[in-house]
Amino acid sequence: MSRRVATITLNPAYDLVGFTPEIERGEVNLVRTTGLHAAGKGINVAKVLKDLGIDVTVGGFLGKDNQDGFQQLFSELGIANRFQVVQGRTRINVKLTEKDGEVTDFNFSGFEVTPDDWERFVNDSLSWLGQFDMVCVSGSLPSGVSPEAFTDWMTRLRSQCPCIIFDSSREALVAGLKAAPWLVKPNRRELEIWAGRKLPEMKDVIDAAHALREQGIAHVVISLGEEGALWVNASGEWIAKPPSVEVVSTVGAGDSMVGGLIYGLLMRESSEHTLRLATAVAALAVSQSNVGITDRTQLAAMMARVDLQPFN
């Protein structure tokens, strides 16, 4: 059985990750650096899938001036690289975790995509993405790419690869949902923004998820933070709660969950097994400073500790 996945990250970043007990505004804050990683949501997903034994191809945009860290990562992991290089620098995101687990992001600006860059990307990506079983589109839109252009590309992509996994936020999320991807993973707040109302009870969240499904989206996975995740599809509704772990960094936890979801779906696992796996992969990511799976035994132990129940 073919098991090929592509991930698209239009606006990747170098993640500078650090820890400080408490951020004091207006003061000098001492930060312990825990890592500097070539990252981006789709790239994080690709790392998880590669660790799980899936062949992955990555694509999107990279800034010409500081692409070396990404090229080195792809080479080390054995990931096929279809990124398009554009003028400028890939942005740097600073992510600081405090002792209470709160994460504050400082996302800097990066390269700008010109109309010619975008036209080339659209034509090139649509020429090769159709050969994959699943395509994961993750992250924000870079400067120069309008929500309308993104919706058009997503719609055209769906006609070539029906199984699109989509994970984004803000204007990119709204634009991408219009193309009715196969699976989406908003968090609760993002779902509230889409629904135009507060969703205080789990029943409200499920009703909003079904409203998304009525638009042609087969799978809706709602990230609930420490409370876990809710999955709604034609077969049912399930909620998974992660085990308690020592939080090192929450950076990439959502991307790790997406990687676990894709793996389970590729392997034709049940919804219950897939959600349990994805929740365990996310919990594992929280307990370390970077995404990835280095110990399958540890992952299996984490899966056994996930509390998964059908929602009644």
Tell what function each PLM region has.
Residues 174, 202-312:
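Conserved phosphate-binding/catalytic region of the ribokinase-like
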Residues 105-107, 132-140, 167, 185-190:
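Short beta-strands and strand-loop turn motifs
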Residues 1-59, 67-69, 312:
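Glycine-rich phosphate/adenosyl-contacting loop at the front of the ribokinase-like
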Residues 50, 158, 266:
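Gly/Ala-rich phosphate-binding loop of Rossmann-like dinucleotide-binding domains
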Residues 5, 54-56, 81, 164, ...:
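Hydrophobic anchor at the start of a short beta-strand
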Residues 49, 187, 254:
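Short, conserved phosphate/pyrophosphate- and ester-handling motifs at nucleotide-, phospho-/glycolipid
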